[in-house]
Every structure is written in C-alpha cells, then in structure tokens.
Amino acid sequence: MTEPPKICQETPPIAIWGGFLLMCLGMFMAILDIQVVATSLPTIQGALHISPEAMSWIQTAYLIAEVIAIPLTGLFTRVLGLRWLFAAAVSLFTLASIGCAFSGSLSTLLVFRVVQGFSGGVVIPAVFSAVFLLFPPRLHAIATTIGGAVAVLAPTIGPVVGGFITETWSWPWLFLINVIPGLIVAVLTPRLVPRQPTDLAELIKLDSLALLLMVLALAGLEIGLKQAPHQGWLSPACAGQLLASGLGIGIFVLRTLRSAHPIVRLAALQQRSFAVGCALSFCLGVGLYGSVYLMPVFLSFVRRHDAFEIGTIMLVTGTAQLLAAPFAAILESRFGARALTAAGFALFALGLGLSSFQPRTADSAEMFWPQVLRGVAIMFCLLPPTRIALGALPEKEIADASALFNLMRNFGGAIGIALIDTILYGRVAIHADDFRARLLAGDLNAAQAIGLDPSLLANRPAGPPTAEEIAFVRPMVEKASLALCVNEAWAMLAGVAILGLLLALLAREQRN
C-alpha cells in the first residue's frame, strides 16, 4: 500500500484542474451515451432486425450494469486509487463502445452494453468524489458547479446529438464518437491527477455473498421497475420481483453494517445531512430524468416532431443550465446550502407545474419558459445538495458516500420513469373512453379539445358513427388523451419537487 502526500491542497496546481476537467469529459461521455442511444433505438432496431420487445434491452442492459457499478465505486477507489480507477473505467468504456459499434447481432451488442454500463457507472460518482478529494473547501463550489453542469447538460443535449448522428451518419457512430475523447481521457488523466492510497488487499477481504446479494437485488429492482407499468405493479410476477429485490437489499444492508470489511461503507447514512442529501438527490433524479423522458414523448407522439427537432427544442433547458451555472457557483459559495436548495426545488416545482397546464397544441414557444425555469432550478437542486451530503464528511468516507449519493439520483430517475409510464399506459384508455362518450353525446367542448371542428359534430346527422367517422376521429382522440396523460405526469413530477422543497428544510445549514 502506497502513502502519497495529501491530495487536497490550498492552491491546487493547474495539472489538477486539467485532470479534473478530463474526468468531467469522461463523465459527459458516459451520460451522453445513454441519451443518444435512447434517441436512436428505432434505427438500431431496423439495422440489426430486432423485435420491438427486445429493443428496450439495449438500454436496460446498460442501466442494470450502471446501477450495480455505482455503489462499488468506493471499493474500487480504495483498491486502485482515484486516478487509476478512472483511467481503467474510461479505457474499458472506450473499448466497449468500439465493440458496440461493430456488433452484428443483439446478443453481441448487449454484452458490450453491459461492459459500457458497468464502466460508465464508475465514472460518475468518481467525479463527485474528486471535487472533495482534489480541492480545498473554498474551491468546492466551483468544482461542484463544473461537474454538476456537465452531469445535467449531457441528458439535455443527448436527443439533438443522437438525432443529428442518425440522420447525418449511421448508428455505429453513436458509439464511435466516444473513441477519441475516451483515449485522451484514459491517457492523460493518470498523468495529471495525484496519487492516492491503494490497497489491493481489499479484494482478498471481499464479502462475495454480500456482493452477490447486491447484484441480484439491484438488477431485479431495475427490471421490476421496467416491467411494472406494463404488467401492473400488483401483478404476481412484478410484485414478487420487487418484493424479493427489496428483501435482498435489506439483507445486504444488515450484512454490510455488521461486516468488518464492507463492500459499501454505509456509515455516512447515520449523518442527518448525508441522509437528507441522498433524499434530495432522489427527488432531483425523478424530476430531471422524468422531464428529459416526458418531453420527447409529447413532442414525438402528439406534436409529431422528429428526433433532431425534439433535441433542438430541448436545448433551451441546457442553455438555461449553462447560463445559470456561474451564478449558482457564486451564490453557492456565499449563502447557505439549505436556503439555495429550497429555492431551487421551489423553482423546479414551478417549472414542472407550468408544463402540467400545456395545451394539446403546445410547441416550442409554449414550452420555452417552463424549460428556462427548470434549467435554472436544476443547478440549485444539484450543487447545494451535493455540499449538504458530502461537504462535512471525512475524506475516507467520500468515495462510498459519493457513490450512494449518485445511486439515489439514478434510482429516482428509474422510479420516476416507471411512474410516468404507469400514468401513460394506465390513463390513456380512460381519457379516450371519456372523449368517445362525450362526442357521442354531442359535447362540442370535447370536439374542440381533440381538435375537431365543432360544427362538424353539431351538423352531424343523428345515429351511430360510421366506420369512416371513427377512423377520422380516432387519431385525434388518441393524441388528446395522451396529451392529458402527459400533463398528469408533469403534475406528478411537480409533486415530487415539492417534496424536495420540504426535505431541504430538514437539512442542517452549511456555509463555506
């Protein structure tokens, strides 16, 4: 085991800043990859002749591997040190990207997606660990702002990047764009980031049973959340799987708390600030990933925009995030984290809530200000909670705590998307039946709501609708019903943001 000099210095050299920026680039690659692939799944499906049911596993395989890797980041950091862990993870991610690009079958693609997800899952918490390991407290706000801006910008611009690549080039380039930046990050990061203690003996003391429990429980939970909206949350198969996953996580936690050499150090959860910070990270995950998922649903299926147009409209959120980032850094270094977090979630709830009133005909103009509010708010929902969660922890707990903090954001996203799908799949038919009944009763307001000229309904002869009339009205009813469900989903996300506001009040005030 090597004993390097203390990393965190009062005046970090330029090399450390360069290394940190390269780490942020690696994190940007990993997060962006999820979104660009999600945007282009139909293209990959057609190229590899994959069924629609199997297509979703291209994303699910990545997400399962990622959620397993995130809590292991602390262990990997203790074994390899920060710089070599990051270099190894980015190298593996780059090689897996090449493998994905040249995959000729679904099975081959899934194998490389698992490798991508596992290596990418290590990268994200490692960056937030670096904020507190490489820099003194007075620079935490600036470093957190840089890392946070990158983390939330990537999902926002992902759709436009994915749409541009699939329309301009071909689907393998969704993965090949990672190669050059991946090589740069893998080669230069270990040269710029200082040494840390390493302890290969951690692998010898590894609790293999706890590791198996964690892998099975997290994978089962991710799959259960994916299937719940389709099969029903209370269906025997889905409910059983979610219950088994929850039981597995409970047993893992009990075993880990009693272990002399835990895989994941959970001691930080005993501190109120860290526990509240994790809850805030969960709420942000619901709103952040939920909104990035929900906007394309509306713009694609209701407004009929293509992938590139959707990405262009969503750039408003990313632009607002970038413009808000320096102000967030200034305020974050001068004011208490609790007050800024509460303000951020209040603004986030407002931006989400405004979208819940958008009409069926809403487009880029109507979506502009809600996007601006959300983009500004997201920076204050990420940066101050990071300081609340990690700012007061001892250095030896940072890596594991950062992993748990980021894991909660990912879980929030998974649960948020599952709840959105539950609303969309479960409520569309209800609204459609209501529209049909109102139209048959001659309700002119219903005609106007679905975009049908009320005079056509008013002047229609009495009697049951003809096949031609049903065919003409059906797509209007479907779009209007989906638009109502989207608004209900926005309202649900706003409710979670309000919960984040209330949780922020429980945090202990911290100032730099």
Region annotations inferred by a language model:
Residues 146-159, 367-451:
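Small-residue-rich alpha-helical segments with characteristic i,i+4
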Residues 39, 63, 70-210, 236:
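Helix-loop-helix hairpins in multi-pass membrane proteins, especially solute transporters
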Residues 14-86, 97, 107-110, 150, ...:
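Transmembrane core module of solute transporters
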Residues 1-12:
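Short, Lys/Arg-rich, polar N-terminal cytosolic tail immediately upstream
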Residues 179-197, 216-226, 245-258, 503-508:
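C-terminal membrane-cytosol helix-exit motif in multi-pass small-molecule transporters
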Residues 98-102, 186-191, 250-254, 353-357, ...:
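Membrane-embedded alpha-helical segments of multi-pass transporters/permeases
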Residues 54, 139-146, 309, 397-404, ...:
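Cytoplasmic loop-to-transmembrane helix junctions
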Residues 54, 388, 409-508:
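Hydrophobic transmembrane architecture of multi-pass small-molecule transporters
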